């Protein structure tokens, strides 16, 4: 396959909990790119099946029969400690354990995978989708994250991009991306709220937009609330109902649980447009009396009752976001709905209650975030002019000071990029060193906030307590990722760190994963080529047998025998699971003999030409041009899988004509 030239495009990727989407700027417009499966979004699912790694739709298709090795909703674990994901672990069929640094990692067949690695597989799929469409190699991307993702989660998402072979030019919040897509062609000043209820997280952002400036005024949310939780209440209800009917607990059967998960997701979607839905799962389990079937009716009203607590949880973050923006609901001009769960009528109703107006349903909640990311990519690449994005940090950042107190340096909803400095001192006489503990959160005591990093400033000259002047600087870049430094004024000694996050990957781990991803890419390519060769060989057997059947009476018996022998050689090579090279050799040999059919037919046609009587007496009316086309198309691809695919298309067209024309 010829190498693509490097693209100047910066693609936009919405790396979602349930589905992912990729978009690119073309002719001044953001375009969502359709996947190789023909869909505009791709399931954020990775599965391991033997030596294969499946991503997207193929992974989703086999989830029911392979639940422990199918990793879905992994975004809920990225950048998090094992101790932080207790509720999420209960909802997935695969094994989640604690990694060497306490991070949540996935255990599949004795091997550990980090959420960053799994995210990288999905990002690679998005990258390949864009490359197939553009015909160019993509190296740069803007990736979106929930607005309420903390520093660890943002840094880990960026690491996933690096593992996927992408230079992540910017990490931007999903609601901000949605606002970009909505407001890029709007005139006048507006204050908007973006209500984003996705598969794994909930965000609310308040923005002011006008004259190409998109300023985030405040953001809030809940990273433990999303569509998965709505699925879970339906699953729990189905398990309870089935136990009442049959006395069997389906919650202990992983395969049944995966089927219930699929059924719950389908029912949830249907209830957005219908008042009730039938849930049918035949042969869901069996007991001593035989197979058992699950048949239930779920009404929209009952679903809303089951999910009422989840819906109610969206209210408080909205009220806080309005208060932080110093606005009332009446100040909001428009409310955008983003994320698949925003289609639920009860969710739309609570949005109407909070903001006092009908939400705007004019954007596609599944695609608008990727479109906004592509627009931001266009801004960074110089393709989109006169757009300025002013984002904020979602949570306060500070350090631990005397008495275990959290002292904020950067308050939540501060516009980024930003730099803040503050002078601190020692707590004891002649203190030689200080430990800077970096915290993120809103609680007054350090222990109640999330520690995202720590480092020591040593060799402080002896001095009474309170005398040393230690300047602590917090520098936050446009991605919302933090850099911290501490400098002793007396000695000039300075120590600084980029907060990699206490949850996150070290540089050597990232490099190893990049190498693994590249190696897997090569192995996947080899597997694909082997599959193409086998498919071509199988197809050639069919065409050879068909040609013999169609033209046996018009070609020498010796040639028929030779072709039949070559067919058996190819068939044996396939059955014996021979190497790709051996199958290719056998196929090429069969191809050479297949061409002799065309030559024999041409020769016979030429010798029969002087006599028209043959045709009058019922001789075969054969179009030799079709035979030429047929024999030429059977030549195996002289190279890679791309040409194999191309040849297959020609073969199918030729076959259609050959079947019809001898009977004309």
From Swiss-Prot:
Organism: Chlamydia felis (strain Fe/C-56)
One Pfam entry name: HSP70
Purpose: Acts as a chaperone.
Keywords: ATP-binding, Chaperone, Nucleotide-binding, Phosphoprotein, Stress response
Annotated spans, Disordered: 574-664
Phylogenetic classification of the source organism: Bacteria, Pseudomonadati, Chlamydiota, Chlamydiia, Chlamydiales
Ranges of Polar residues composition bias in the record: 639-649
Compositional bias of kind Basic and acidic residues: 574-592
Family: Belongs to the heat shock protein 70 family.
Induction of the gene: By stress conditions e.g. heat shock.
InterPro entries: ATPase_NBD, Chaperone_DnaK, Heat_shock_70_CS, HSP70_C_sf, HSP70_peptide-bd_sf, Hsp_70_fam
SUPFAM superfamilies, A to Z: Actin-like ATPase domain, Heat shock protein 70kD (HSP70), C-terminal subdomain, Heat shock protein 70kD (HSP70), peptide-binding domain
Protein name: Chaperone protein DnaK
Gene behind the chain: dnaK
Keyword hit for Chaperone: yes
């Amino acid at each position: 396959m010829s190498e693509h030239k490097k693209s100047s495009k910066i693609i936009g990727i919405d790396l979602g909990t349930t589905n992912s989407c990729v978009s690119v700027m073309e002719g001044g417009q953001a375009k969502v790119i359709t996947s190789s499966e023909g869909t505009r979004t791709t399931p954020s699912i990775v599965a391991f099946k033997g030596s294969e790694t499946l991503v997207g739709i193929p992974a989703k298709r086999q989830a029911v029969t392979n639940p422990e090795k199918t990793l879905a909703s992994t975004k809920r674990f990225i950048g998090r400690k094992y101790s932080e994901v207790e509720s999420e672990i209960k909802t997935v069929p695969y094994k989640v354990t604690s990694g060497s640094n306490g991070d949540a990692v996935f255990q599949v067949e004795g091997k550990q995978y980090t959420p960053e690695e799994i995210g990288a597989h999905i990002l690679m799929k998005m990258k390949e989708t864009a490359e197939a469409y553009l015909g160019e190699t993509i190296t740069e991307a803007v990736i979106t994250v929930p607005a309420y993702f903390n520093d660890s989660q943002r840094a880990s998402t960026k690491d996933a991009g690096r593992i996927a072979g992408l230079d992540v030019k910017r990490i931007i919040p999903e609601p901000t991306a949605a606002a970009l897509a909505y407001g890029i062609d709007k005139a006048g000043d507006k204050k908007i709220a973006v209500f984003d209820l996705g598969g794994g997280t909930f965000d609310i952002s308040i923005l002011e937009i006008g004259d190409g400036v998109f300023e985030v005024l405040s953001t809030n949310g809940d990273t433990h609330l999303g569509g998965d939780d709505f699925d879970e209440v339906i699953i729990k209800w189905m398990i309870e109902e089935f136990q009442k009917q049959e006395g069997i607990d389906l919650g202990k059967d992983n395969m049944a649980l995966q089927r219930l998960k699929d059924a719950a997701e389908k029912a949830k979607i249907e209830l957005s447009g219908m008042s009730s839905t039938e849930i049918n799962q035949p042969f869901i389990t069996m007991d001593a009396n035989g197979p058992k079937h699950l048949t239930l009716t779920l009404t929209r009203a009952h679903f809303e009752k089951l999910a009422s607590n989840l819906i109610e949880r969206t209210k408080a973050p909205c009220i806080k976001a309005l208060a932080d923006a110093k606005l009332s609901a009446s100040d909001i001009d428009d409310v955008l709905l983003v994320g698949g769960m925003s289609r639920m009528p009860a969710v739309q109703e609570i949005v109407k209650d909070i903001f006092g107006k009908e939400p705007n349903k004019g954007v596609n909640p599944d695609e608008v975030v990727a479109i906004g990311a592509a627009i931001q990519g266009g801004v960074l690449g110089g393709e989109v002019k006169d757009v300025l994005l002013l984002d904020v940090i979602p949570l306060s950042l500070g350090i631990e000071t005397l008495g275990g107190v959290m002292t904020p340096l950067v308050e939540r909803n501060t516009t980024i990029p930003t730099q803040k400095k503050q002078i601190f001192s020692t707590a004891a006489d002649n203190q030689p060193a200080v430990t800077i503990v970096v915290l993120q959160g809103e609680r007054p005591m350090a222990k109640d906030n999330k520690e995202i990093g720590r480092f020591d400033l040593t060799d402080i000259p002896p001095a009474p307590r309170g005398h040393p002047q230690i300047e602590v600087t917090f520098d936050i870049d446009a991605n919302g990722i933090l850099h911290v430094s501490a400098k002793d004024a007396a000695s000039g000694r300075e120590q600084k760190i980029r907060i990699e996050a206490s949850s996150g990957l070290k540089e050597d781990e990232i490099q190893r994963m990049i190498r693994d991803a590249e190696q897997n890419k090569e192995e996947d390519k080899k597997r694909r080529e082997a599959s193409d060769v086998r498919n071509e060989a199988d197809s050639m057997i069919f065409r050879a047998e068909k040609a013999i059947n169609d033209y046996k009476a018009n070609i020498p018996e010796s040639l028929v025998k030779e072709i039949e022998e070559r067919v058996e050689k190819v068939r044996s090579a396939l059955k014996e699971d021979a190497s790709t090279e051996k199958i290719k050799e056998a196929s090429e040999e069969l191809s050479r003999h297949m061409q002799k059919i065309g030559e024999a037919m041409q020769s016979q046609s030429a010798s029969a030409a002087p006599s028209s009587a043959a045709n009058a007496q019922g001789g075969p009316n054969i179009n030799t041009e079709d035979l030429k086309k047929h024999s030429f198309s059977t030549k195996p691809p002289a190279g890679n899988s791309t040409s194999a695919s191309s040849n297959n298309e020609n073969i199918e067209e030729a076959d259609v004509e050959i079947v019809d024309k001898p009977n004309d």
